Amino acid sequence: MASTIASYKQVMPAEEYDDETYADALTTAQSDGKIAADNGGASLISVVAAKDASGAETGYIVKGSAAGYGGSVIVVVGVDADLKVTGISFPETLPETAGLGQKATEPAFYEQFAGKGTKLSVKKGGGAGEDEIDAISGATITSTAVTNTVNAATEFVQDYILK
């Protein structure tokens, strides 16, 4: 549990984390299949409401996964009420190739997501625009898996929480 809370704090610091408020919305999203269909098969695992000291929601933390090159890539995504990504983290070791897909855990890659909105795409060769993420050279599959999971998280918050 300590590593889970640490991954939450990395993407969205809060006084309290509530994993019960949106459990029904998560079940609905998982069963209707729209989010997976819209985001390259990315799936949602859990959702947590981040709260301040007064109990007011400050954002949402969504844990999801998508198929990477070496296996399932699990990503924790912080999303604020303006549908901006506050950060991402990897709660488990990535099953990706060392020196390639493993570079997703380096700040040069994962810090690109902070402040971005919905419907991001992966751009090869650098020079990513506002709604784009620079792919890791030689690891486009991993880059796409992470981006699809982030997109699934923001779509879930938009369509099932803030609707």
Where is each model-derived feature located?
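Flexible, solvent-exposed loop/hinge segments and secondary-structure transition points
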Residues: 1-163
